[in-house]
Amino acid sequence: MGLLFTPKHQKLVNQCYPTGRTPDKKPKSSETSYLLYYVNSRRTKLEKVSAYLVKRTAADLAHRRIGNVMVTLELAEKIVTSCKENLNVFVKEFLDIMIKTLSNNNFNLDVCVVEAAEAVFSSICQHLDGVLCNSDLEFTQMYRSFVDVYCQVVTERLHNDELLMKGCLDISKTANLAGNPGVSSLISRGVELTLAKFQEVQPRFQGESLQVDLHSSEKRLSRSQTHLTAAEESRVLGGYPEQALQSYFSTTETDKLSIAIRALIKRLLEVPNKELLQYIANTIPVQLRYILVLVFTHALNQEDEHAVVLLKLMTTLLVSDVSIIGLSVLDLLRKIINFQLASATSPQVTEACTNTISALNRKTYYKDQPIDMISELLLKLKEHPGQREKDILISDLQAVLQTVGQPFMTLELFLELAPYVPDRLELFSLVTDKLPGGFVMNKFFLFLVALESPGEQEKLLDDAFAKYKNFTLLSGLIYFLEEGNTPSNLYYCYHTKAARFLEFDDYHSQAQYKRQEREIFTRNDLVNYYSDPGCNRYAEKGLRILISQNTRVSTTDLTETPPEGELQIPDIPLPPTPPTPQQHRMFLNSDASVKSLDKMKSPKVSDLKRAARGIRVAPSHSSLRASQSVKSRVTNITFLLNELNNESQETGIYDPEEEEVVGLEKTDLARSISAKVSPAIAYSSKRFGNLTSSLDLELQEDAFQDASGEIEASSAFRGKLFSS
């Protein structure tokens, strides 16, 4: 009767177990398939099946049924794989089953049982998501408890390194494990165990190896590669330790990678081995390898006795063939310098920091990297005036310069570095042939004057002629004409080398003679050598310098030749020419007439007729006040009246009544003004003279003055003054 009322999920689970007490049982295949279909149909079925498996496992453990426990673990592994979307429903029950199984001393000595538990754990780790790991505290505790029990069993009871590496590999497959502080330490633990076993099976990674050779390799690009990659080497080595290391370090999870690198540093401090470090670095994705260098930098501590080891390991990594991209060179340089200055009392630490800075510049991560590093060191030199700090920074500066094998700096940067570098000739060999500015060349000659060694002066001047050629020639000519026109070794050295550069034997002989007599070249002496363009291709530029009052000639003037025949005339501002009295008088009259337009009243035709008949116009009639800008008003009015009478007689134009006449507008008056400036052609002055005597206008404000000349208008204006 008991079997009649057994729940269906229990029946399906029980049917998967074979009969008998043999330890090597396997679940029945057909019944297992139906059970998987059953648990996939509804979510509630999973809860019932997982709870029943926990209950049955407890009974099997109590009765030492190893075969049934093996069947239970295999069923659990199949359910995890089949129902991974609902893993959070039953995962804690399955972890409980595995913890109880491995905690039972009657079962944890059986390798098969432990392997079956590891298979279930591996399946769980592969399908876990970050939400479950970070939100469920109970699951986190059970996960950690199982790892502790499992590692204890395989190391203390079974002594099985393969199972240990499998467990470490399973931990590395758990996604987003680093985000949970409760279980993130398991990553560090797994890396340490894996590295220890890996070094045991690989002899070349055993023992200390910290030799740093900073002079064997030349400066090269950061993406060089000369040996097997990590993936290729892993295939050659084989085994679970290599697979586990690949899983821990060949990841794009930066949190997980940082934890793994810190575990690596802890192991390397125990047994420093640069080959192991380079192998692990090649395992990391190339775009994330800069994290390895950053973690090493963060691990530095001036109170830590392992600082020298860390710096040496970092140095070996930077000079190795490991490709690193995305490294912030200046940030790393600043951190190392700050640590170095803070540990200035320790010679070993400061020397190790100098080697690391030198190694940092042995690979080119971007174009202007050496210039930026040197500029940063120069800035630190200005910020730290103490002698001890200066000595340390100068040592760093010289170490960086030794890593550069080709010209890269400007002349201006050379002048800033020269006071801190003893071998200035070697330093000048790193200067490019890019033309500097005239001010920089002037500073260069001032620097040469300050040098105490004549041989050094001569050699640097030779190199300057070799790099800048005619620019050095003309810049030196400017300098010695303006500031250095005194007898000195550099003065005669310049003229001697200028003569050799121009291939003038006479110039060279004069330079030797004046050196002996302690005389200087005058401008006239030098003009002789720059006066013939046929012999001296730089004659025109040199002559401009010699005859110029201002010797400050621009770089463009020294490097470019103006077109032939072009005359360089200086722009001299001319003083303004004062106007003549006649121009001034015309200007005043014109201005007054224009201003008086607004005050004038327009004349009427009746006013003009009255004036023509000799009738005096009363002051109250608002008589005309015409313009005086060019000629007299009398002449103007006479011309208008005569024009009106002639046109009326010839064409018979109707003369409107006085009350219908519209006064002249100001625009009409302005047109009449424009007519006054035209030369008289059609009319003679005699016609005006007869009417002038009859005109007697009283002006209201302006002082009347008759015109000194007569005016005539062209026929082009006839009859058009009143047409509007």
Curated annotation (Swiss-Prot):
Source species: Eremothecium gossypii (strain ATCC 10895 / CBS 109.51 / FGSC 9923 / NRRL Y-1056)
UniProt GO BP: protein localization to plasma membrane
GO cellular component: plasma membrane
Name of this chain's protein: Protein EFR3
Family indicated by similarity: Belongs to the EFR3 family.
Entries under InterPro entries matching the protein: ARM-type_fold (IPR016024), EFR3 (IPR039786), EFR3_HEAT-like_rpt (IPR049150)
